[in-house]
């Protein structure tokens, strides 16, 4: 078990705020929009660690995941990764599995509040049970195939489940964007809100859920994510292995 005060202020890139059992998880970079980095101690490791603690905390009953400012995540900083070799990729491989698996191990409802463009790790939001998106939000995977990297860190599994195999492959190969309204039409966005009302609406839904029996929430989340967890268990490690081999080949190793 985890106790919120023991980890609430532990993370540099993840701001945690809890009120009445509702936990807001906000990713950021020095108080501004988050920048994704897989360097040692970067958000790639921190967010998975945060999900691990949240999953072990019986005091949290609903989670709201969001970004900072007008952007969820659009930038990647590769400078901090350092020399890419087998040991570095072993670390990234482990962190990549933890990121997805620890998120899915959270046994309370997760609401994704999409505050703007989500072009990097948009799957973290769309894996939420309820996705509330700003009218300005767009979803894409621009950090993999468009940059010569294999999309193997779970996006190859989840976007296929959301969009179907052909649409997902087009989405991942091209880095094309899907707007909030189109996401709602396709079924992975629940509600589209005015830009300045997204987080507020997510909290409204969180309060509605919070009023329901806690064990019902936990057991429902577990039932609804079991098939996703099974697919990730089967295919996430394989995808990460191929992604690592591709990265090393790009570097001539």
What feature does the model see in each segment?
Residues 99, 103, 118-171, 205:
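CoA-thioester-processing core
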Residues 25, 65, 124-126, 183, ...:
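Hydrophobic/aromatic residues within transmembrane alpha-helices
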Residues 132-137, 189-236:
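C-terminal long alpha-helix characteristic of the crotonase
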Residues 113-118, 172-176:
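Glycine-rich beta-to-alpha transition loops that act as phosphate-gripper elements at the mouths
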């Amino acid at each position: 078990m985890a106790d919120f005060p023991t980890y609430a202020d532990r993370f540099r890139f993840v701001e945690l705020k809890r009120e009445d059992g509702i936990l807001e998880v906000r990713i950021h970079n020095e108080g501004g929009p988050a920048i994704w980095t897989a360097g040692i101690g970067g958000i790639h490791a921190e967010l998975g660690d945060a999900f691990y603690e949240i999953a072990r905390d019986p005091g949290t009953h609903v989670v709201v995941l969001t970004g900072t400012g007008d952007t969820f995540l659009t930038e990647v900083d590769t400078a901090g990764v350092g020399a890419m070799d087998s040991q570095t990729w072993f670390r990234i491989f482990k962190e990549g599995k933890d990121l997805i698996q620890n998120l899915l191990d959270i046994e309370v409802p997760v609401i994704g509040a999409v505050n703007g463009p989500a072009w990097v790790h948009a799957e973290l939001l769309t894996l939420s049970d309820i996705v509330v998106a700003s009218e300005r939000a767009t979803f894409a995977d621009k950090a993999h195939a468009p940059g010569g990297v294999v999309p193997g860190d779970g996006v190859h599994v989840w976007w296929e489940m959301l969009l179907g195999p052909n649409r997902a492959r087009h989405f991942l190969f091209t880095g094309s964007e899907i707007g909030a309204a189109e996401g709602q039409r396709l079924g992975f966005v629940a509600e589209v809100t005015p830009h300045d009302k997204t987080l507020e609406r997510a909290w409204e839904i969180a309060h509605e859920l919070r009023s329901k029996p806690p064990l019902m929430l936990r057991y429902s989340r577990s039932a609804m994510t079991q098939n996703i967890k099974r697919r990730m268990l089967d295919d996430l490690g394989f995808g990460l292995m191929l992604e690592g081999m591709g990265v090393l080949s790009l570097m001539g190793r």
